[in-house]
């Protein structure tokens, strides 16, 4: 009786492991597909201020911030802490990274760790912004933004699959 119970538990565990592996494979295929279509949205839930200050900030974000690629356009609604070098402003306010701009360049490659590395460049008024995005097979995403006018900043979130 004990052997039958143990065998049932082991077989159930194997089925669960197979189901998890199948779900991971399916999710990786979905991530790959949305990236290939160049039509995806990344919902951002935290950020890291990478400015040259001694004080590093990494707040959780309470609102729905996002980065979206729609074919040849980049749409962002992201907060920005740090310094605006052209305007001489510090802090966060109405000057977040709010964009709806055509993409100047879009490059994607697969890294050695099986992550997708995407580099998107957009030009806005007198600034050029470069978005470097790392997307893992499970949809976790890291976004690093470089700008001529603002301090560098990073965001962390997940790609939306539905």
Please identify what each model-predicted range represents.
Residues 45-70, 77:
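Extracytoplasmic beta-rich ectodomain segments of secreted or membrane-anchored proteins
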Residues 1-2:
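Bacterial N-terminal signal peptides that target proteins for export
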Residues 99-162:
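Helix-rich interaction surfaces within compact, conserved domain-sized segments
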Residues 39, 71-75, 140:
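Structural motif
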Residues 15-18:
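Bacterial signal peptide processing site
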Residues 11-13:
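C-terminal motif of bacterial Sec signal peptides marking the signal peptidase cleavage site
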Residues 63-111:
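Mid-length scaffold segments of soluble, non-membrane domains
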Residues 33-49:
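A short, Trp-centered hydrophobic/proline-enriched beta-strand micro-motif
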């Amino acid at each position: 009786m004990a052997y039958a119970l143990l065998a049932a538990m082991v077989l159930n565990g194997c089925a669960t492991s197979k189901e998890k592996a199948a779900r991971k494979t399916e999710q990786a295929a979905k991530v790959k597909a949305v990236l290939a279509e160049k039509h995806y949205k990344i919902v951002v839930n935290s950020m890291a201020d990478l400015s040259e200050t001694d004080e590093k900030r990494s707040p959780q974000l309470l609102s729905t911030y996002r980065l979206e690629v729609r074919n040849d356009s980049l749409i962002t609604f992201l907060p920005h802490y740090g310094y605006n070098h052209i305007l001489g402003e510090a802090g966060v306010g109405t000057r977040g990274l709010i964009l709806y701009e055509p993409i100047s360049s879009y490059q994607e490659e697969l890294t050695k760790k099986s992550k997708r590395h995407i580099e998107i460049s957009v030009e806005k008024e007198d600034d050029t912004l470069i978005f470097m995005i790392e997307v893992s097979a499970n949809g976790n995403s890291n976004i690093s933004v470089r700008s001529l006018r603002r301090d560098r900043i990073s965001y962390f979130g997940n790609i939306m699959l539905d």
